[in-house]
Structure formats: structure tokens, C-alpha cells
């Protein structure tokens, strides 16, 4: 499975991180297969970072090959959705950004992409452009979002 992710895609989160620049194009990054953490397995904080952050994400499973797909046909190219957590070694990311280096080591480390069980878009509410999602840790809500708030859809 190839993971293609859009970084800096929520204005509110960008503001929390102190990003003031508004990107005209999406920031794309990828994660390798070894980043996938599923089936309820535990996440272990890597020893190479002192500052691992989490971001709750909506994950869409692509089911067909395609390229330059018109937005009105996009629904034909996915078949399931779930919630996920994108773990980031934020201390490394700051260092890499300052040096103009790629993010693979801070975003693509083993088990840095936790994903839930996929369900059909209909089971998730139908409209992927208006999905609510949240993250609870030990019974306390720590993040909440809606796909309508994405900068790039």
C-alpha cells in the first residue's frame, strides 16, 4: 500500500504550529509500507526523537489506477475510508525544514501511520467532504476536525 499524504492541509492546525504562509499548492509527502500500523497494535515512541506529535487524519483507500482525474469523477477511484493518526518526529522536522531537506525520516518512520478499520463511504456518512472525526486519548478528546476544513480536497 502506498501512502500519499497532504501536509499543512488544515488552516487551524497550521496556525497552532506557527505557520503563517498560505500555500497555493498542496504539500505532498509519502510514507512507506513499513509506516503502516493497524489491527489495534500499539505505537511505541521512537528513541530517535524527543518530540513526537500526532495528527488525526481521514484516510481514503484508492481502488483504481488513475491520473489527472476530474473532481466530478473522483468518487469512482476510492472505495473505503477510515480514521488514522499521522505521527511526526517534530524536532527532526524542524531541523530538516531549516536545512531544506526532505521529511521522510521525521514522517515515514516505522509505525508512523496508524490506521483504523476501513468502512464504505456510505457507512461513514456518504459525503467525504463533510466528515467529522476526532481522537480520544484515555477517554478524553484531544483533537476534532471536519474534512470541510481542508485547504486542499
What are these regions, as identified by a protein language model?
Residues 1-153:
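Catalytic-core "active-site belt" of small-molecule-metabolizing enzymes
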Amino acid at each position: 500500500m502506498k501512502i500519499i499524504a497532504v501536509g499543512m492541509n488544515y488552516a487551524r492546525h497550521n496556525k497552532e504550529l506557527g505557520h503563517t504562509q498560505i500555500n497555493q499548492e498542496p504539500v505532498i509527502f509519502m510514507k512507506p509500507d513499513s509506516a503502516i500500523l493497524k489491527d489495534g497494535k500499539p505505537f511505541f515512541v521512537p528513541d530517535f526523537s524527543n518530540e513526537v506529535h500526532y495528527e488525526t487524519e481521514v484516510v481514503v483507500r484508492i481502488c483504481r489506477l488513475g491520473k489527472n482525474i476530474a473532481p466530478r469523477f473522483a468518487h469512482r477511484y476510492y472505495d473505503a475510508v477510515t480514521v488514522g493518526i499521522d505521527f511526526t518526529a517534530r524536532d527532526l522536522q524542524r531541523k530538516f525544514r531549516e536545512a531544506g531537506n526532505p521529511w521522510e525520516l521525521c514522517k515515514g518512520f516505522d509505525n508512523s501511520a496508524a490506521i483504523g478499520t476501513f468502512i464504505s463511504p456510505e457507512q461513514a456518512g456518504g459525503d467525504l467532504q463533510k466528515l467529522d472525526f476526532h481522537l480520544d486519548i484515555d477517554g478524553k478528546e484531544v483533537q476534532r476536525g471536519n474534512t470541510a476544513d481542508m485547504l486542499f480536497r
